[in-house]
Curated annotation (Swiss-Prot):
Compartment list: Cytoplasm
Tagged with keyword tRNA-binding: yes
Protein's UniProt name: tRNA-cytidine(32) 2-sulfurtransferase
Gene Ontology CC: one annotated term: cytoplasm
EC number: 2.8.1.-
Length: 310
C-alpha cells in the first residue's frame, strides 16, 4: 500500500469515527430530552455556519435509521445583509435533496436604522430573527424548531450569566416559547465545537462567513469563550467536567430559597436524597477522567437505537 493510500485510509477511518461520535451524541441528546417524537416535522434553522450545517447533516443521517418517523425542512432567513451570497444555500440544499424555504426579510435595514453605528446589533437582530422563525414554523406546520447551539455555547452562556447577570442559567436543550406555541430544541447539546469544526472541514460545507453585518463582536461572550479555550488547553477534560456538573445539581447545597425549603429544616428531620453537611470535613473530590474522547458521553439514558448509515 502506497503512502498516499495509507493516508487516505487513515483519513476515512478518522472521519467515520468522528461521524459516529457526533451521531451518538446527537442521538443521546434527542433521547434524554425527548427532542424529537414520532410524526414530528423538524424545522432546522440554517445560517450557513459550521454548526447549522452539521446539525442538518447529522439529523438527515439519523432520519434514515431512526425507529421513529419525522420530517425535516431547512429554513434560512435572508436578512438582506450587503454581500450575502444568496445562491449558496439554495444550491447546497437542492444538491442534497432536502426540503427547504428561504425567508427574505430586511431585518438588516431595520437594525441599521435603530442601532447607532458601531454598537452591537446582536440583541435586536436576535429578537427580530426569533419572531420571523416562529412565524415561519407555524406557516410550515413545524412541530419542532432545531437550533445549532452546541455544548461549548451552553457552557459559555452559563459563565456569561454568572459573570455578568448574577444567575446560574445556561441555554436549555429544549424549551417552549413564551406563548406556548413553539418548542425549540438543540440536538447538538452534547457535541463539542472542536468535533463540529473537524466535521465541517471534512464535509466541505459551503460556509458563509458571519462577519457580514459589520456589528461589533459580543465582547463579553468572546472573553468567556477565550477563557474556556484556555482552560481546555491547560487542563484537558475540564470542559467535560463542567458540563457534567450542569447535569448534577444539588439544590440543598446552593443558596436559592425558592428552590429549596431552608426555613423548613427542623431538628431531628431526616430528608431522603439530601446530602449531608461537609462544613467540618475536608471534602475529597476525585477528578473525573475523560482520557478517551470517544468515551465522552453525557447521556443519562440509552440512546435511541439508530442503525449505522454510511
Amino acid at each position: 500500500m502506497t503512502q498516499l493510500a495509507q493516508q487516505e485510509k487513515k483519513q476515512t477511518y478518522n472521519f467515520n469515527k468522528l461521524q459516529k461520535r457526533l451521531r451518538r451524541n446527537v442521538g443521546n441528546a434527542i433521547a434524554d430530552f425527548g427532542m424529537i417524537e414520532d410524526g414530528d416535522k423538524v424545522m432546522v434553522c440554517l445560517s450557513g455556519g459550521k454548526d447549522s450545517y452539521t446539525l442538518l447533516d447529522i439529523l438527515l443521517n439519523l432520519q434514515q435509521s431512526a425507529p421513529i418517523k419525522f420530517d425535516i425542512v431547512a429554513v434560512n432567513l435572508d436578512q438582506k445583509q450587503p454581500g450575502f451570497p444568496e445562491h449558496v444555500l439554495p444550491e447546497y440544499l437542492e444538491s442534497i435533496g432536502v426540503d427547504y424555504k428561504i425567508v427574505q426579510e430586511n431585518t438588516y435595514g431595520i437594525v441599521k436604522e435603530k442601532i447607532p453605528e458601531g454598537k452591537t446589533t446582536c440583541s435586536l437582530c436576535s429578537r427580530l430573527r426569533r419572531g420571523i422563525l416562529y412565524r415561519t414554523a407555524t406557516e410550515l406546520g413545524a412541530t419542532k424548531i432545531a437550533l445549532g447551539h452546541h455544548r461549548d455555547d451552553m457552557l459559555a452562556t452559563l459563565f456569561l450569566n454568572m459573570f455578568y447577570g448574577g444567575k446560574m442559567k445556561s441555554m436549555p436543550p429544549k424549551l417552549i416559547s413564551d406563548d406556548g406555541k413553539q418548542i425549540v430544541i438543540r440536538p447538538l447539546a452534547y457535541c463539542k465545537e472542536k468535533d463540529i469544526e473537524k466535521y465541517a472541514i471534512a464535509k466541505k460545507f459551503p460556509i458563509i462567513p458571519c462577519n457580514l453585518c459589520g456589528s461589533q463582536p459580543n465582547l463579553q461572550r468572546q472573553v468567556v469563550k477565550e477563557m474556556l479555550n484556555t482552560w481546555d488547553r491547560q487542563y484537558p477534560g475540564r470542559l467535560e467536567t463542567m458540563f457534567s456538573a450542569m447535569q448534577n445539581i444539588t439544590l440543598s447545597h446552593m443558596c436559592d430559597p425558592k428552590l429549596f425549603d431552608f426555613k423548613g429544616i427542623k431538628h431531628g428531620q431526616l430528608i431522603d436524597g439530601i446530602e449531608g453537611d461537609t462544613a467540618f470535613d475536608e471534602e475529597r473530590i476525585t477528578p473525573m477522567q475523560f482520557e478517551d474522547e470517544d468515551q465522552t458521553d453525557f447521556s443519562n439514558n440509552e440512546m435511541i437505537n439508530f442503525k449505522e448509515v454510511n
